[in-house]
Design a protein with these regions (language model features):
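Cytosolic-side transmembrane-helix boundaries in multi-pass membrane proteins
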Residues: 1-23, 203-210, 284-335
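Short loop segments and helix-boundary regions at transmembrane helix junctions
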Residues: 2-6, 59-64, 85, 103-145, ...
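Hydrophobic alpha-helical transmembrane segments
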Residues: 11-16, 41, 49, 70-74, ...
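Single transmembrane alpha-helix segments in multi-pass membrane proteins
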Residues: 21-87, 111-118, 253, 257-267, ...
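Transmembrane helix-bundle core of multi-pass membrane transporters
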Residues: 120-184, 211, 233-242, 320-335
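Structural signal for alpha-helical transmembrane segments and their membrane-water exit/capping regions
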Residues: 17-33, 135-139, 179-186, 308
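Helix-loop-helix "hairpin" substructures at the membrane interface of multi-pass membrane proteins
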Residues: 89-94, 98, 104-109, 113, ...
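Transmembrane alpha-helical segments in multi-pass inner-membrane proteins
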Residues: 223, 233-298
Length: 335
């Protein structure tokens, strides 16, 4: 029962926990709850939100993409190098290029998983190392710093619009677009079916492998998009940019209730999971707790979330099997 209750109300519970955390920390450090700091905290979490949306779509199909941070680092380095050497290239063109390069890396992951049948975790661990290696080959271990980047390249994510930086609006737009895609498009709904019930997917003409390919393409494109956003926000590009950040991305999804077994999860949960980690990241230094505790806290929450998610999913799986058996009996009676 607890698992079912968690699955049904996880977003509300997470939102409540986030509000309580902000309130508790604000009671000790009033500046933490100032409007400016709350806006900055959301802005700090924006890239995590976008990446988590991409990871969510892969998880829905029973896959996982551990190469997202390496994809981000490689695309970010490429556009940073281009900007440093050819500052006249429009920033919008560089942003589009980063997205297309990320899409290409997603295509590579998707084809290896779909066509060759290699487990997603193996493929993306391999491509993660390959992408990092390519960065080293391109730069010989060197850096691209803010002095080499143009003012337009650095200013775009920081540009204010209706009280929020453009980076925050990118995250909001991604939430709305992915939410619409998963809820109302045929392909979006097929991602759920492909990961949640392979038998139902087969009988309804959905190619589960192809849906995994689509999810990796979308994940790669979002990672590439974030490549420019990350580099321009932090004004530096080097081999180890966002190293290990893929674990934060997976954590945001799992905490938000996206099942690692596929077919279950919502965009709102993904948002709440990312915000939960964002609050922790910003709160620990404020209250004087070592950042290393962040890893321990995140790990404990991930384990708890996985246990609750999978407990609920077992009951959901039994319901699917029961309905499938009933449908087969009805079909047998008709024939």
């Amino acid at each position: 029962m607890m698992g079912h209750a968690w699955l049904k109300h996880r977003e509300a519970l997470l939102a409540l926990v986030i509000i309580l955390m902000i309130g508790a920390i604000g009671s000790r450090a009033p500046s933490f709850v100032s409007p400016g700091n709350l806006v900055e905290m959301f802005n700090d979490t924006a890239i995590l939100i976008i990446l988590a949306l991409g990871q969510m779509m892969v998880l829905l199909t029973k896959g996982i993409d551990l190469s997202m941070a390496a994809n981000l680092a490689l695309t970010g380095m490429i556009v940073a190098l281009l900007n440093a050497h050819y500052p006249g290239i429009p920033v919008v063109a560089l942003l589009a290029l980063a997205t297309l390069l990320g899409l290409l890396m997603g295509v590579i992951n998707g084809l290896l998983v779909w066509r060759l049948g290699i487990p997603a975790i193996v493929v993306t661990l391999g491509t993660m190392s390959i992408y990092r290696g390519i960065i080293f080959l391109l730069t010989d271990g060197g850096w691209v710093n803010s002095h080499q980047m143009s003012a337009d390249f650095l200013s775009l994510p920081r540009s204010p619009l209706l009280g929020l930086p453009l980076l925050s609006w990118c995250a909001i737009a991604a939430l709305l677009l992915v939410g619409y895609f998963l809820r109302y498009s045929r392909t979006g709904r097929a991602l759920y079916t492909a990961g949640g019930n392979a038998t139902a997917a087969y009988y309804t003409g959905i190619n589960a492998g192809k849906m995994q390919f689509v999810s990796f393409c979308l994940s790669g494109a979002l990672a590439g998009f974030c490549g420019y956003l990350w580099i321009s926000r932090f004004a530096v590009a080097y081999v180890d940019v966002a190293n290990g950040f893929e674990l934060q991305v997976v954590a945001a999804c799992v905490i938000g209730g996206i099942s690692t077994m596929g077919g279950s999860g919502r965009v709102l949960g993904c948002l709440c999971g990312a915000l939960f980690l964002g609050v922790i990241n910003n709160a620990l230094p404020v209250i004087g707790i070592s950042p290393f505790w962040q890893m321990a806290i995140s790990g404990a929450v991930i384990v708890m979330a996985v246990l609750l998610n999978e407990r609920g999913n077992r009951g959901h799986g039994r319901l699917i099997l029961r309905n499938a058996a009933l449908a087969r009996r009805k079909q047998a009676v008709k024939s």
